[in-house]
């Protein structure tokens, strides 16, 4: 039975490359999400330009709020696809480490 040595795994260059790749995706995505999400309440609290009508009686604030739903769906779909790629990479890494152990 394979017993993982997590310190050894964390020290491997391939695992470090994986973490770098994962961080390169997650950190910018999270920053974008939080900025986009919190900009609506901040902008509507301190500015009035979002109150202007955009399409008929629908204001820019409503369009921004609807865009947040779309952004959430798109970001979660992109993350799900990227996570599948990460899972494949980790599975291959585990197989490589098992091969080195035996």
UniProtKB/Swiss-Prot annotation:
Highest taxon of the lineage: Bacteria
Q: Name one GO cellular component term.
A: plasma membrane
TM ranges: 24-44, 55-75
Q: Where in the cell is it found?
A: Cell membrane
Instruction: Keyword check for Phosphoprotein, yes or no.
Output: no
What Pfam families does the annotation carry? Answer: DUF485
Keyword Transmembrane helix attached: yes
Q: How does it sit in the membrane?
A: Multi-pass membrane protein
Q: Which UniProt keywords apply?
A: Cell membrane, Membrane, Transmembrane, Transmembrane helix
Which InterPro entries would you find in this protein's record? Answer: DUF485
Name-wise, this protein is Uncharacterized protein YwcB
Provide the species name.
Bacillus subtilis (strain 168)
Recorded name of the encoding gene:
ywcB
